[in-house]
């Protein structure tokens, strides 16, 4: 017998593993590429808006801690949820994800995500970039056939029958799925399940990026990272003298460094001058990213970059502050998921892990040389708090975003 109130649980896991590199000049996408990814590029500006708003929301909770999350993971899970939401619940989800409904139709939103996920999971992709969606359904719960069909067609979702009456077995089944999909990097995502849960939706994203040109491991040395004016922590720091795409923003007092991965992903690392990080955070928007990208110049610098190991673990009920409210309470209308009228989202958890180090590089044994101007290059030391954003270039999608306040994760 079903309980009087049914709960849906949303779990999101993201892993980003990076190995060191340098930057190459940005290449303009061809018309063919523009057309090939047109559906996804239609939704990417809204995803960028959401990424920045969610970042600011996390900063408002604590401006002294590391931040790391996967906007694409959150986006994928909640648009999948929107497939089965109706009326105000659906409107709130799509508006909270920053879609402007006067500019883009629901058809184009879901079409864009279908193309996006297909692009990520291509076997010939040089990047190790995969996403997965798991639907864990109580063995006694009957889902609406259209929701199952659409989630499979648009999101390639896996469906599992689950006995939620056996709480421990259900947790193990779901955690084993997450561990497998993140290649063992995220374990025990679910610590507890509400007793009345009958449906769990899990999204996983796994990304391992290899930089085009590696740092030399023998140059890595310990340096002090300045957490704040009173605190430093020792951190293993990679060093490289070379040609990089960089820009110093005089208006915001920050360095911008673009790093290119093998394949179609890039990262922007933003290093504010001491005491200027809040100024930069307040200025973040799409136009600022465009300004930085336009002004990047290839030049010689002496780069110091710390090894990073941080994670983020977030209760996504904070999305209420972005206007997504009904789905979490008694007003939820998820009648497109199940014919039961009392289904609500009781738990929504997102965990993401990032490691930036020298492990796993396949560039060992390769030789690389480049010309450096005779003049003394500037030194750029990422040895104080910095912001970063990782994008998939073809689709212009934000994969990960974060802030490093302490690269050791403490």
Swiss-Prot record:
Q: Where is this region: RCL?
A: 365-384
What pairs make up the disulfide bonds? none
Q: Give Gene Ontology CC terms.
A: extracellular space
- Note the SUPFAM superfamilies from the entry: Serpins
- Molecular function terms, GO-annotated: serine-type endopeptidase inhibitor activity
Q: Which domain of life is it from?
A: Eukaryota
Q: In which tissues is it expressed?
A: Plasma.
- Site feature: Reactive bond: 374-375
Residue span of the signal peptide, if any? Answer: 1-21
* The keyword Signal belongs to this UniProt entry's keyword annotation: yes
Coarse class of the primary localization is secreted
An example Gene Ontology biological process? acute-phase response
One Pfam match, given by its short name, reads Serpin
> Which locations, inside or outside the cell, does it occupy?
Secreted
Phosphoserine found at: 375
Instruction: Write out the entry's keywords from A to Z.
Output: Acute phase, Glycoprotein, Phosphoprotein, Protease inhibitor, Secreted, Serine protease inhibitor, Signal
Glycan attachment sites: 63, 100, 264
Q: Which family is this sequence assigned to?
A: Belongs to the serpin family.
Function as written in the Swiss-Prot or TrEMBL entry:
Inhibitor of serine proteases. The primary target is elastase, but also has a moderate affinity for plasmin and thrombin.
The domain section of the record reads: The reactive center loop (RCL) extends out from the body of the protein and directs binding to the target protease. The protease cleaves the serpin at the reactive site within the RCL, establishing a covalent linkage between the carboxyl group of the serpin reactive site and the serine hydroxyl of the protease. The resulting inactive serpin-protease complex is highly stable.
Protein name per Swiss-Prot or TrEMBL? Alpha-1-antiproteinase
| Organism of provenance | Didelphis virginiana (North American opossum)
